[in-house]
C-alpha cells in the first residue's frame, strides 16, 4: 500500500550519489522534539511544527513540506536561522478536523536536481530521514473526543480458556455427548490435550477437561492475590469445540461452562473484588454446527441456511452453489463466513436494543475482545463501538490486530484502527515479537527501542495506554518454550504432546521470561497473563499451549515473580500513566523510562512527580550501563525494586546489571 505519492524509489535502496547529495544534506528525525512538536499522534484541530536542518549553510534553497492524504499540499518552509552552523527551516501546519493519517516529506530543487528527504524504508513512517527516499513520514490525526476507559491503562489482564482453568461443580460436562456429538472427557486434569486431526489438517478439538465458570469464580481470590483486575475469557458461547471459536448460539452460554446466571454471578463477585470481565466476540464466522447454518442437522432437518434456502439466516452466508459450496474462514468448512454487512445480521449482532453485543454488556461484562478484527468491515466496527458505548461508556472494544494498527494493510486496503472511531485498542503483538527478538539475540536493543518508539509515535495516547500487552496466548506456543529456544516447531505435530524442555532449557527460558515480564509490566498498556504462564506451564503450539492450569503443581519461583511484578506496577502509578521513552544503553540492554513531571501524568492529569527506569540485560554476562541525572528528571538517587541504592556522581549513574537479570529503579 502506497504512502504518499507512488514512490519512485524505496528507502534503503542504494541511491546514486549526485553532486547535490554530496554538497547538501537534509536532516529530520520524527522522534526528536526539536524536529517535530508535539511528539506522537495529534488530535483534530491541533497544530504541528516540523523542522528541517540543512547541513550546508550557504545552500540557496527553497524548501517545501509536502503533505499528502489523497490530495497533495505543499507548504513553503521558512528559514529560522543558524544553529551550530546549520540552517534551520520550519513549517507549522494545522491538521484539520478530520481523523486520518497524514503523510509528509521534504523536497527542494537544488542545482538542477530534485532533492527529497523521506522516511526510512522500514514501513513504520517514523525515524531519521533518508536522503532520496520518497517514502513518507506518518502523522496520525485522531478524533479529539476519543478516549478509552481508565481501567484499561490501569489494569492487569488475565486470559482464561474456561475449559482448561478450573473444574467447579454444577455444570454438565457431558452435555455435548448427550446431543449425539463424539467428545472425549478427560478424567485426569493434568494429562495433555489430545490431537485429533481431521483430513484438512485441522484439529477436531473435541476433548474437554470440564473447566467452567464456577471454577473461575472459586479462584477469584487467587486472581486477586496475583494482582489481576481484568479477566478476558476466550469464547464462552455454545459451540461444538473446546475452543468455542465456532459459535453455535450467540445468546447462550455453553452449558459445559454454566449458564447466564453463572456468568452474572461471576461478574458480580469479580466486580466486588475490583475485577472486570471481557468476552471474546467471534463475528466474522460461525460454526457449521450452529443454529444459523446447521450443516449437521443438530437443530432440525429443515432449519438453518445449509438446509433451507428460505431460512431467515440464509442471507448471512455466501453460497457459490448451495448447499455445499460456500465461503468459509481460511478454507475450513466447519467455519462458514458471515456477511457482516447483511442488514439482518447487523441488527442481530449490533443494532437491536437487545443485540448480541448490547445484551452481554447489559449482563455485567465490560466489553469485547474481537477475534480477527482486521477481517471485519470498518463500518461494522464503527457501529459495534457505537452500540457498546451506548450501553456503557466504560465498556471496551479491543481488537485482534497483529501489526502496527495505525496502518494495517488487510485485503489490499490500508486500515487505521487508531483514529477513535473503531477500536479502543488492540493486542500488542508487535511489542511481544520485538521483545522475543531482543531476548533471543535476533535484534539489538537499539533496533527494538526504535520499533517501540515508532509504535508510540503512531498511536494516540488513549490507544497506546490501553494496549493488551500479551506475552503468551492460545494462538502461540507457551512463552517459556519460545524463550527457551525450543517450541517444538521442528518436530512432527503428532510428537509434540511428549515434548519436554530439558532442565537447562527450562532454566534459561525462565530467566528470559522474567526479563520479558518485567519489561511488560513497565510499559504503557495492560500487561496480560495467559493462564498458567505464571505457574511455569510449558507446551508447543495448539493444542499443547492449551494445557490445564497445574493447581498444586505450580513453579513457585515463577509465580512469585509474577506476583512481584504485578504488585510493583499496581503500587506505582507512574508505571501506568507516566510518560514513556525507550532507551538502548548498549546492544544487550534494553530500557524504558517512565515519568510524571510538573505534577502531571502523560494525560495531563494531576499526579505526583515520579520517575522509574527499567533495564533488562539479555547477555549472560554482567553489564555496566550509564544514565545521566537528566535522564531521570534530575534525580540524584535511584532505588531498585530489590533494594539497591544508586547515587549520581558528576551527574551520572553507573548501574551494574547481572547476566540475564533486570531491575526497575525509582527516583528518590
PLM feature spans:
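Conserved, mostly hydrophobic/aromatic
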Residues: 52, 160, 223, 233, ...
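Glycan-association/targeting regions that enable binding to alpha-glucans and other polysaccharides
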Residues: 2-154, 158-159
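Substrate-binding/active-site clefts of carbohydrate-active enzymes
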Residues: 161-230, 236-362, 384-390, 407
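Aromatic/acidic polysaccharide-binding cleft in carbohydrate-active enzymes
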Residues: 163, 411-412, 425, 468-501, ...
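C-terminal beta-strand-rich structural cap/linker in extracellular carbohydrate-active enzymes
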Residues: 56, 649-668
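Beta-strand-rich binding/interaction modules
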Residues: 59-70, 102-104, 622-643
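Carbohydrate-binding surface patches
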Residues: 583-632
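Active-site-proximal helices and loops of the catalytic beta/alpha 8
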Residues: 267-276, 284-285, 290-301, 356, ...
Amino acid at each position: 500500500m502506497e504512502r504518499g505519492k507512488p514512490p519512485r524509489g524505496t528507502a534503503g535502496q542504494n541511491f546514486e550519489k549526485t553532486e547535490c547529495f554530496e554538497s547538501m544534506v537534509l536532516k529530520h528525525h520524527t522522534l526528536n522534539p526539536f524536529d517535530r512538536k508535539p511528539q506522537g499522534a495529534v488530535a483534530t484541530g491541533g497544530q504541528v511544527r516540523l523542522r528541517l536542518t540543512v547541513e550546508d549553510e550557504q545552500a540557496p534553497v527553497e524548501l517545501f513540506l509536502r503533505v499528502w492524504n489523497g490530495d497533495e499540499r505543499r507548504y513553503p518552509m521558512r528559514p529560522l536561522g543558524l544553529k551550530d552552523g546549520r540552517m534551520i527551516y520550519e513549517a507549522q501546519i494545522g491538521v484539520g478536523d478530520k481523523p486520518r493519517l497524514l503523510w509528509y516529506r521534504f523536497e527542494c530543487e537544488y542545482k538542477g536536481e530534485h532533492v527529497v528527504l523521506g522516511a526510512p524504508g522500514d514501513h513504520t513512517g517514523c525515524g531519521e530521514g533518508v536522503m532520496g527516499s520518497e517514502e513518507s513520514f506518518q502523522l496520525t490525526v485522531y478524533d479529539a473526543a476519543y478516549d478509552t476507559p481508565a481501567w484499561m491503562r490501569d489494569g492487569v489482564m488475565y486470559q482464561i480458556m474456561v475449559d482448561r482453568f478450573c473444574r467447579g461443580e454444577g455444570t454438565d460436562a457431558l452435555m455435548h455427548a448427550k446431543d449425539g456429538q463424539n467428545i472425549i472427557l478427560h478424567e485426569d486434569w493434568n494429562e495433555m490435550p489430545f490431537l485429533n486431526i481431521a483430513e484438512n489438517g485441522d484439529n477436531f478439538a473435541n476433548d474437554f477437561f470440564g473447566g467452567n465458570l464456577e471454577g473461575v469464580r472459586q479462584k477469584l481470590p487467587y486472581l486477586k492475590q496475583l494482582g489481576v483486575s481484568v479477566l478476558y475469557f476466550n469464547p464462552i458461547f455454545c459451540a461444538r469445540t473446546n475452543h468455542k471459536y465456532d459459535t453455535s448460539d450467540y445468546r447462550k452460554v455453553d452449558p459445559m461452562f454454566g449458564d447466564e446466571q453463572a456468568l452474572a454471578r461471576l461478574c458480580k463477585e469479580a466486580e466486588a473484588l475490583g475485577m472486570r470481565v471481557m468476552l471474546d466476540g467471534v463475528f466474522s464466522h460461525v460454526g457449521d454446527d450452529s443454529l444459523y447454518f446447521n450443516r449437521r442437522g443438530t437443530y432440525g432437518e429443515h432449519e438453518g441456511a445449509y438446509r433451507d434456502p428460505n431460512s431467515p439466516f440464509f442471507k448471512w452466508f455466501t453460497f457459490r452453489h448451495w448447499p455445499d459450496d460456500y465461503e468459509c474462514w481460511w478454507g475450513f468448512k466447519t467455519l462458514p463466513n458471515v456477511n457482516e454487512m447483511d442488514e439482518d445480521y447487523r441488527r442481530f449482532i449490533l443494532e437491536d436494543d437487545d443485540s448480541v453485543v448490547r445484551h452481554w454488556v447489559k449482563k455485567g461484562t465490560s466489553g469485547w475482545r474481537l477475534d480477527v478484527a482486521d477481517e471485519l468491515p470498518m463500518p461494522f466496527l464503527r457501529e459495534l463501538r457505537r452500540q457498546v458505548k451506548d450501553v456503557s461508556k466504560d465498556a471496551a472494544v479491543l481488537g485482534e490486530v497483529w501489526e502496527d494498527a495505525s496502518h494495517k494493510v488487510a485485503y489490499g486496503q490500508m486500515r487505521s484502527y487508531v483514529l477513535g472511531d473503531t477500536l479502543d485498542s488492540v493486542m500488542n503483538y508487535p511489542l511481544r515479537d520485538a521483545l522475543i527478538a531482543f531476548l533471543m539475540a535476533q535484534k539489538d536493543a537499539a533496533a527494538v527501542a526504535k520499533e517501540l518508539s515508532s509504535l508510540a509515535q503512531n498511536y494516540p495516547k488513549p490507544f497506546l495506554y490501553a494496549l493488551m500487552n500479551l506475552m503468551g496466548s492460545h494462538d502461540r506456543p507457551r512463552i517459556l518454550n519460545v524463550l527457551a529456544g525450543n517450541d517444538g516447531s521442528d518436530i512432527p505435530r503428532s510428537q509434540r504432546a511428549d515434548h519436554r524442555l530439558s532442565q537447562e532449557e527450562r532454566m534459561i527460558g525462565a530467566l528470559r521470561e522474567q526479563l520479558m515480564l518485567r519489561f511488560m509490566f513497565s510499559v504503557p498498556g495492560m500487561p496480560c497473563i495467559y493462564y498458567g504462564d505464571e505457574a511455569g506451564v510449558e507446551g508447543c503450539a495448539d493444542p499443547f499451549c492449551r494445557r490445564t492450569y497445574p493447581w498444586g503443581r505450580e513453579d513457585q519461583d515463577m509465580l512469585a515473580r509474577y506476583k512481584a511484578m504485578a504488585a510493583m506496577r499496581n503500587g506505582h502509578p507512574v508505571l501506568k500513566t507516566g510518560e514513556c521513552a525507550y532507551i538502548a544503553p548498549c546492544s544487550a540492554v534494553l530500557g524504558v523510562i517512565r515519568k510524571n513531571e510538573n505534577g502531571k501524568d502523560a494525560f495531563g492529569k494531576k499526579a505526583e512527580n515520579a520517575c522509574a527506569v527499567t533495564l533488562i540485560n539479555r547477555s549472560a554476562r554482567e553489564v555496566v550501563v550509564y544514565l545521566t541525572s537528566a535522564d531521570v528528571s534530575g534525580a540524584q538517587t535511584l532505588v531498585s525494586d530489590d533494594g539497591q541504592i544508586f547515587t549520581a556522581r558528576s551527574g551520572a549513574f553507573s548501574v551494574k546489571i547481572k547476566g540475564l537479570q533486570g531491575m526497575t529503579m525509582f527516583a528518590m
